[in-house]
Amino acid sequence: AMGSDRPRFITLEQYAKDVRKLLDLVPHDVDCVAGVARSGLYPASMVAMWLHKPMIIVSQSSGKIVEAGNGWRLGNGHTHVKPSTGKVLVVDDTVMTGGSQAIIRGVVGKQFANVVYATVYCNPAANLGKPDIHAVDLQWPHMLEWNLFNSVISASTAVDFDGILCHDCRPEQDDDGPRYLDFIKNARPLYLPRKEPLPLIVTARIEKYREPTEAWLKRHGVRWKKLIMHPAKSTREREKTDVAAYKAENFERWAKTHTPSPGPVMFIESEHNQAREIARITKRMVVCPATATVWN
């Protein structure tokens, strides 16, 4: 069971369930739903469909409000619903400090007089402004599956390769030969970092596959500072070693010299048992997205 003080990993499945909780809390007398781009568009469109109301999009960066199209079923015949005269429900995914919330209130408040703010998640410690309605309390730090490498923690995150950056190698591809090389070249991306370079990748792939591995990263626009590959000469030789200990050792060496800001330093590992072992050895935060588990 998850302790309340334990950082959470929110999967997309969990997110959908929590959006469902929000649907039960929103007022039905609103004239229009406003989604905050980009993070709030998923819950906002669900709320708009649920309430059968038109939707508009609020851009935090440009301060603009855009119509999202209402579909032919909305509005009475061809009379267009004018959100500006009515009650607006603003929807976003999370409020952590309340800073973004304050900006959005400024943008929306200029154009609409009657506004209700709702988010799926809210940090109980948000000090700059909380929404009027939220479905779930979510403390900091936490990871969102859809925002894994786009958060402020990214700069302090070391990662495993297969099963995180790309889908795992299937057993029949693992021949340490042509099939495996084909897998490395054509692996399907999974969680791709776009915001900033990954400080450290530690992979069980062996050193001789460095060139195609780096080529794959470049092709998918992934930037990284350090890529550590297994020193074994063959995958058979590697199988005799303790891969979790190898990852833990390299993670720890980097973590000791890394200054987290805002922190915490963590490792993202695709395999549950390895993740648990890396956490045990290093006593640091390790996340396994596949099982939505966080060791702290």
What feature does the model see in each segment?
Residues 92-93, 160-162, 267-272:
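Acidic di-acidic motifs
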